[in-house]
């Protein structure tokens, strides 16, 4: 296909127009008084959102060169979202500012490669200073503040803080759409997996159709149990001990199933059988997780295990087990805490090593089940449009909270960036164009606070000067129009989000400045359609 080419200033200006179109659309959402953007959807109602990356993903421009610029900045938002889960609007805004300031200097004759070196040096210094002013997250109150700022809603902040308190920092919190009007929290403590009882005759509560076992023993095997003779020696020991039994096996069928059900109905002893969760290698890993949690052993042919030789000390234990038609929940497994910790660390190492999104999700689920539980935030609203908007806000708040727990918090509202300006401005370079790069970052660091003020209908430059001349940590609360200590006021941003936004913006923007030629496809002209033939009298 034939290509069209642009060079030098013309190429950069065309791409900058695309950058500005995308960034100007996204940046109206920044801050407590930021507005929303409405996105047309081919199917269903339009989506109203203030999530930077969601807006950026929707933007495709007709002009090929403008679209190239827009796609580059979209990468800034996407990468920041992948790393930190929030801060995508800030990252887009910073990229626009660095590109704008950089292009002025490139047009004036500065060398873009040297400018890039200066930008890199300044960003490294800024990140170092941001980490110095970072404070660790202390308790539920800090978590609630981070989530409330991200979602612009104190109720959501409290809800996420409750969820994290219940499932722990390693626990999994998912966001789902609710059929009711309100937003609520549903917590599943302990380990739950999607396998129910193999026979309805095993239930202990016929009204709720569920089996609840207190202080049961847990038999874990990857074998199919069909011959009752394999189980008899173990069952006799369990009956003598007066214990209840949960069997997790590949399957329970035939004679074994009949015997277990008959004994349950006669009241000889209580036993519930469930199929092992997962498939293939994942099933083996999940059975090992259950064994670690309950302090049992997986009886498997792979390690020479035989059901006939199984003893009580091979079985796991738990405080309680609840089995429904669809799921099994093991609460407070009696496994060795040191072994559980080692298993958790092992899964974390696998998480770091894998590149598959699917594997990551499954490993994260396993981690949560071992480390505490799963919380589900059920989002409710009056209309589908409001529901989608709320769900995106909560997902952002959740990501921001996890980022804050990981690396700590800094003063919010763009204050952290303004606070590090003085230290970055002290950097000097003998090479003039590198110094230009440093100065570009110094100016760009003001941009988030300026935009937050602008979205609140105020003059950003005046506010920035006042914050610069105030004590460290003092910023501008755009919601109330007051200057205050941001951390004490609970206006905070996660360090990871603040750092990632700047690093990703600088990475893409500085590379953008080095562009000297742009190549794009020549758009195909549509051929005019021919006139229709007359078909009078034909039906």
Curated annotation (Swiss-Prot):
Together with its co-chaperonin GroES, plays an essential role in assisting protein folding. The GroEL-GroES system forms a nano-cage that allows encapsulation of the non-native substrate proteins and provides a physical environment optimized to promote and accelerate protein folding. Disulfide bonds: none annotated. This is Chaperonin GroEL. The lineage of its organism: Bacteria, Bacillati, Bacillota, Clostridia, Eubacteriales. ATP binds at residues 29-32, 86-90, 413, 477-479, 493. Keywords: ATP-binding, Chaperone, Cytoplasm, Isomerase, Nucleotide-binding. It is found in: Cytoplasm. Belongs to the chaperonin (HSP60) family. It comes from Clostridium perfringens (strain 13 / Type A). The keyword Isomerase applies.
């Amino acid at each position: 296909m034939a290509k069209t080419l642009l060079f030098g200033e013309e190429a950069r200006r065309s791409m900058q127009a695309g950058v500005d179109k995308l960034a100007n659309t996204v940046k109206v959402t920044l801050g407590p008084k930021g507005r929303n953007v409405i996105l047309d959807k081919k199917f269903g109602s339009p989506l109203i959102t203030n999530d930077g990356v969601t807006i950026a993903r929707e933007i495709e421009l007709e002009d090929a060169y403008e679209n190239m610029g827009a796609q580059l900045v979209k990468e800034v938002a996407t990468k920041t979202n992948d790393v930190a889960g929030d801060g995508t609007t800030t990252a887009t805004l910073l990229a626009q500012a660095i590109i704008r300031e950089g292009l002025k200097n490139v047009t004036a004759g500065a060398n873009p490669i040297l400018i890039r070196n200066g930008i890199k040096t300044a960003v490294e210094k800024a990140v170092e200073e941001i980490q110095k002013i970072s404070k660790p997250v202390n308790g539920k109150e800090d978590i609630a503040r981070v989530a409330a700022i991200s979602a612009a809603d104190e109720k959501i902040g409290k809800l996420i803080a409750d969820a994290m308190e219940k499932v722990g920092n390693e626990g999994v919190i998912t966001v789902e759409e609710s059929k009711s009007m309100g937003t609520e929290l549903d917590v599943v403590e302990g380990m739950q997996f999607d396998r129910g009882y193999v026979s309805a005759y095993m239930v202990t509560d016929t009204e709720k159709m569920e089996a609840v076992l207190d202080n049961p023993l847990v038999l874990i095997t990857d074998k199919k149990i069909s011959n009752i003779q394999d189980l008899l020696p173990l069952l006799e020991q369990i009956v003598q001990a007066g214990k209840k039994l949960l069997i997790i096996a590949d399957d329970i069928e035939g004679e074994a199933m009949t015997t277990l059900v008959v004994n349950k109905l006669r009241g000889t002893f209580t036993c519930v059988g469930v199929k092992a969760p997962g498939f293939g290698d994942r099933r083996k890993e999940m059975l090992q997780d259950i064994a670690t949690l309950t302090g049992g052993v997986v009886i498997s042919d792979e390690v020479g295990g035989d059901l006939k030789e199984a003893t009580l000390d091979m079985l796991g234990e738990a405080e309680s087990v609840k089995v429904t038609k669809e799921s099994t929940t093991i609460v407070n497994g009696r496994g060795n805490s040191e072994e559980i910790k080692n298993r958790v660390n092992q899964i974390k190492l696998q998480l770091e090593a894998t590149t598959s999104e699917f594997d990551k999700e499954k490993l994260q689920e396993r981690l949560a089940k071992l480390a505490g539980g799963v919380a589900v935030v059920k989002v409710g609203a009056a209309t589908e449009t409001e529901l989608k908007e709320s769900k995106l806000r909560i997902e952002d708040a959740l990501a921001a909270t996890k980022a804050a727990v990981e690396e700590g918090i800094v003063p919010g509202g763009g204050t952290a960036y303004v606070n590090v300006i003085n230290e970055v401005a002290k950097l000097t370079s003998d090479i003039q164009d590198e110094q230009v790069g440093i100065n570009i970052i110094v100016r760009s660091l003001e941009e988030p606070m300026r935009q937050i003020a602008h979205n609140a209908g105020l003059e950003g430059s005046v506010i920035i000067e006042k914050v610069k001349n105030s004590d460290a940590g003092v910023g501008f609360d755009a919601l109330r129009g007051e200057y205050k200590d941001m951390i004490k006021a609970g206006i905070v941003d996660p360090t990871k989000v603040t750092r990632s936004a700047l690093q990703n913006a600088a990475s893409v923007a500085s590379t953008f400045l080095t562009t000297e030629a742009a190549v794009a496809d020549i758009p195909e002209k549509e051929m005019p359609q021919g006139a229709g033939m007359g078909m009078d009298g034909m039906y």
